Regions:
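N-terminal beta-propeller domains
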Residues: 1-84, 133-198
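Short linear motifs in intrinsically disordered
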Residues: 57-59, 65-68, 98-100, 105-110
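Short coil/turn segments at the loop-to-beta-strand junctions that recur within blades
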Residues: 55, 90-97, 130-134
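Beta-propeller fold detector
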Residues: 86-91, 125-130, 165-169
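A broadly used, surface-exposed interaction patch
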Residues: 78-107
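Hydrophobic or amphipathic alpha-helical targeting/insertion segments
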Residues: 100-127
């Protein structure tokens, strides 16, 4: 079962990283830190929980008490609390980009630069042949939003009907003349769209 775990960022084990360590190169939060001697040290207590059956990067999403793992090869797995990874791929997630997901009341949707794929029931399937080729997908108050890959436009579905993509249900973000490369829906149902220059 998926669950959030508080990470004690302000505890002593995390406080000994010098600020200069972050100025000496790129940094990101993982299961390691840079010591005062500028070496890497792994946090204690972390261990492998499950090895995925297929190689590649894995993107995790929580869905109805399970973890959903999507690999960079497009395979989708449902991971139960008993450490089993069941392949639920009928239609792979394609596009070759980082996988994004949106949760509706009944399904979870995936986009990665190709057609939008949904997991509803036991297997994945194509959301709609009319849906845009998208790198990002989001859900707000009964509407599914998706950017049109390589453009400044995004489309939305009819309310509550996620397979219905009317060609007139489109907006253009024209504050900057660049393609939309990000779509985020905040916990307050605000939609943020961004591109490389905006």
């Amino acid at each position: 079962m998926a669950r959030w775990v508080e990470m004690p960022i302000f505890s002593p084990v995390y406080e000994n990283v010098a600020e200069t360590a972050l100025r000496n190169g790129n940094a990101r939060l993982e299961n390691a830190f840079i010591t005062e001697a500028k070496t890497h040290s792994r946090f204690p207590g972390l261990k492998t929980w499950l090895r995925m059956p297929s190689p590649g990067k894995v993107y995790l999403f929580d869905w109805r008490g399970d973890l959903i793992a999507v690999t960079s090869f497009g395979l989708v797995y449902r991971i139960g609390s008993d450490k089993t990874a069941n392949n639920v791929t009928l239609t792979p997630v394609s596009g070759g980009r980082r996988v994004t997901a949106a949760r509706t009341q009944d399904e979870i949707l995936f986009a990665a630069g190709g057609p939008i794929v949904r997991l509803i029931g036991a297997k994945t399937e194509l959301l709609s042949k009319d849906a845009p080729i998208a790198t990002h997908v989001g859900y707000v108050d009964g509407y599914v939003l998706a950017n049109e890959a390589g453009s400044g436009r995004f489309q939305y579905t009819d309310a509550g009907v996620y397979t219905s993509w009317d060609p007139l249900n489109v907006f253009t973000a024209e504050s900057k003349d660049d393609p939309l490369t990000a779509l985020v829906v905040t916990p307050f149902n605000e939609t943020i769209l961004a591109g490389p220059s905006s």
